[in-house]
A protein has these predicted regions:
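Phosphate-binding/catalytic loop of phosphoryl-transfer enzymes
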Residues: 1-35
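An extended, acidic
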Residues: 11-13, 23-26, 36-183
Length: 183
């Protein structure tokens, strides 16, 4: 049985249940669990942001959905968000089924720090297909400072094409008053 995803991350023959393997500098490969067939994957490269969408947690308390959606809208994403849990959001991004994954500090706990195990594997999968993963300030994620990303603030993962636009939107002051989080 494959993963329970709200989108189909499947082979062209309809086979479900896949594994993503990424090696720094060698790309990301998608492997079908049942057949063993594999192929390299690439991030969505289109500049048509009308077809892009945000990936977000089903559990809206896992982040700041108001700010996350405001940023997605500010960079032109208009499709309904793709809601799923776990690192499957990174998989959807790597396969081009989403263009952006944002996870900003909770409104209830603006000093919250992410756990490395929630992002390390997904980050390399996205980066190796040509996407980018940073924090809200554009800094690379620091996976070498313990079990939490204490040197980072939030997560911005993109197909690469949108990344600088997202960081620019985050620097805009007008997004923050309505979202109860400060820069």
């Amino acid at each position: 049985m494959g993963p329970a995803l709200s989108v189909s991350i499947a082979q062209s023959d309809g086979e479900k249940g896949v594994l993503f393997v990424a090696v720094r500098g060698q790309g990301t490969t998608l492997i079908a669990l049942k057949s063993g067939h594999s192929h390299p994957i690439n991030a969505a490269s289109t500049q048509n942001t009308g077809n892009f969408r945000l990936a977000e947690s089903i559990e809206l308390g896992h982040g700041n959905p108001t700010l996350q959606r405001a940023v997605a809208q500010a960079v032109g994403l208009s499709a309904p968000p793709l809601q799923m849990d776990s690192q499957a959001k990174y998989a959807a991004l790597a396969c081009g089924q989403a263009a952006l994954y944002l996870r900003f500090p909770w409104i209830q706990d603006p000093d919250y720090k992410e756990n490395i195990w929630d992002h390390a594997a997904g980050a390399i999968v996205v980066e190796e297909v040509g996407g980018r993963v940073t924090d809200m300030d554009g800094k690379p994620l620091d996976f070498f400072c313990g079990v939490q990303l204490v040197n980072n603030r939030g997560i911005v993962a993109s197909n690469g094409a949108l990344h600088e636009h997202v960081l620019a939107a985050l620097r805009r002051n007008d997004l923050y008053p309505a979202t109860s989080i400060s820069k």
